[in-house]
Amino acid sequence: MCAGFYVAVHPWLEAQSLHKVGHTGNLAARLHDGSYTTCFTDEWKYCFTLETSTKKDAQKIEAGVLYCAQFFRVKNKELVCLLPEKIKQLAEDVANCLDISYTLCDSPAYEMNDSTIVVEPSLPSDPLISKEKLRHLVITPVEDEEHFADDVLFFSTDETRTAIEDRLYQKEAANMGYQELRRSGRAILQMACRCGKTRVAYLILSNYLQGKVLYLVPGLSLLRQTLEKLYQYGISLKNVLLVGSDQTRIVLNHDNIEMTTNPVFIAKRIREAPSLLVIATYQSSTLLVDDFDLIISDECHRICGEWETRPFTHVLLNFKKGHRLFLTATPRYDTPLSMKNRELFGGVAFRYYLREGIEAGYVNDFELQMVAAPKLAHQPSTKEETTKQIIVKQIIMALAHLKTNITAPKMLVFTRDIKQAKELYAELVDQGVYALIAHSTLPRQVILKTFTEFCSSKEPVILLNCRLFQEGVEVPELNAVFFAAPRHSPRDIIQSICRPLNKQVQKPHATIFLPLEVNTENVCLDRFSSIIPFADALASEDPRFYEHLLNPSEVAYPINWIGAHGSVSELLQLARHAIRYGTQGKIDRLTRSERLPWKAAFAELKRTVEICCRYPKINDGFHFGGATLRFDTWYKWVIKSYLQYKNKEPSSLEPYQVSDLESLQDWTTRGVGGPYPWEESMAFLETWLAQNKGELVAIDIHQGGWIGLDATPMERLSGVLTTVSQRDGRSYGKNKKLRPKKGFMIPPQQAQDLDRIFGKHNLKWRKDRVNGFLKEDEHGNYTGEPTCIQEAYRTFKEYVKTNPDYIEKYWPGYAKGKHKHQELPHIWEKGLAPPRYKAFKDGNKQLIQRSPKKKDVKN
């Protein structure tokens, strides 16, 4: 006899998505005793068993599973409304926590004979287990919503197939992703929903098809969808293995294939095949072996969470071989195991914004509608009831708004939890609204029926849910989403926003409704706090929204307000102010360097380099979305972050941003090192003095050389020696008017270089001092012996008048004002240079265009 814990299923229960949980001392006989055969037909079968050494151990596992699945248990019955894979993982976790040894058997068939029929001794009905040990395993309805949706909506979506096309950005994404894989072995592709991540993955995995590739997806529905797409792209089923718990044969044209969860067959196929593509669910990943050249993790934000081994993290934490490619629209950075971990995930090799997909025509556009809090005719007795009544009215207002343009609109309502969904549903139905509800505690067939009714409805309808339809569910006719409770996770927000953004012919723009506890009588910044996380998430995906927040008069955005009786423009202005400065209204949250949209800021940097032939000056300005910014602040942040990245330190930059920077001319030398490189200039100085008999000849220390990328060695040396001359004698004090200039600000190593090079030729480069103070008159003019640098500058000024050919040879363009303006003459004359940033004492900022005056224009 074999004791064990089991999960059994019967067709009558399966129709309601119910599974029988139990324990026995005799697995071979259990399904044949009276409790199973009296009221049921003989169609019982095991989904799986955990064979144990004693019946008592099996009973403990059962008790633990029922405790952890309490929210999904039929009252007073050992019936659980969870998928078998979910129960299996839970049972194994319970056994491990209770230190019970077991052997897992999938779909076992035990041989029945007369010797197996024995009367089992009874055990206490409530075995002693440590619930404290198991508390972290308890499955809450909210937590299970996403995992339930992975498989429950398996037959509910029909994606329209379009002709295969390689969009330009997909080719770029595939190239950058593959290059990053070759460089570091790991890469993230962050691409907006509905922009073709699977196609990009196919282009990349095509480079690995001579070996073994693993493609992980979160659920059976996406497994089928991924297989269909890859087959459409040209993958042959001969070298494909599907690992998942659905036994339905998949037919593709004249080909067909089945999934498997047989661990022996899976391991043998992977180890023996010279080339193989395995498509598996994360839930079945524990059946795989570590022998892949490339592992693709789709919807990889689902991996993130607690730092523990579970099906979604099994491959990430335990497999050592192969390159890793991670695909997501919404990286997750707010959990202990997060995508900030570069060692595990790598960095973002390519990013494609939601706004880019909209403007390219691949994603439907949308509008934002904030919904004011209506007045209630009768004030409820509790705050909770008041909030519920307000949200119900706001939902009705939102649906009415949709009906003004759409005959039969469909709206998804996302709630805080299942409890709130049930309460809102009951209230809406009482008020005559056509409302539906779906959540993970309902049987699968009920959810599918509800979802089908929602999709096919010819009347205005809303569907309430918590997270069941937050991602991965396609409703082509969906028109709007309504946030009945604030969302704080950027991932949750963006995934929810994307639900109605399917692109269809003649489909109107979608609407995102944000209810607020604001009306014309209670306007204050605190009332807008709930939309700040939403705005932050949207601004990171939509640069146009970011620009609108900075200056709505210059950058329009489809955002409005319904249910407001006062000035809509004033309410929107307050909302924008709260988003930008916070509810305290003190700090500009949007103009920090790390918040500037990368593409816009980098485009200005690239323009400066390619058009102006230089890197930014310290006083360059930047006009973005109506904001006046000092570009040098962002530029210094970029250099600092770049050096951190190259030194393998924590950095704000992603690989695609590093690639952008390194594509610029002379980035590592002039961009990072600056226009006046010390070592390079010292080498030139040493050679120059040797060739000119120890004479510096002429040097310009007035206009500081030339910062352009095409600068001559003499122009760069001029810049270096300008800095030396300025620092020689500079005071350490903050208030220079009150302290004598006695400091020496040249770094010791640089001073040693100058002593060595000038000393060879007995040249004096330091200014004279008395008791540490510079020799100066009462007006602060230097009165000591001139240095060789000062003498060379006098010669330079003479040569400007008497030897223009010499000046043009070593300082080309000097006569045309290049050095005066620190811009190429044609750039200056055409006004193409970045504006000059100027800050005033009163806090105002101004950008002054660098443009020529008449006397500056050279004929």
UniProtKB/Swiss-Prot annotation:
Signal peptide: none annotated. A motif (DEAH box) lies at residues 298-301. Its EC number is 3.6.4.-. Residues 401-553 form the Helicase C-terminal domain. The lineage of its organism: Viruses, Varidnaviria, Bamfordvirae, Nucleocytoviricota, Pokkesviricetes. Residues 178-349 form the Helicase ATP-binding domain. It holds the Pfam family T5orf172. This is Probable helicase A859L. SUPFAM superfamilies: P-loop containing nucleoside triphosphate hydrolases. It comes from African swine fever virus (isolate Warthog/Namibia/Wart80/1980). Keywords: ATP-binding, Helicase, Hydrolase, Nucleotide-binding. InterPro entries: Helicase/UvrB_N, Helicase_ATP-bd, Helicase_C-like, Helicase_Restrict-Modif_Enz, P-loop_NTPase, Phage_T5_Orf172_DNA-bd. GO terms for molecular function: ATP binding; DNA binding; helicase activity; hydrolase activity. PANTHER family: ATP-DEPENDENT HELICASE IRC3-RELATED, TYPE I RESTRICTION ENZYME ECOKI R PROTEIN. Belongs to the asfivirus helicase A859L family. PROSITE patterns: HELICASE_ATP_BIND_1 (PS51192), HELICASE_CTER (PS51194). ATP binds at residues 191-198.
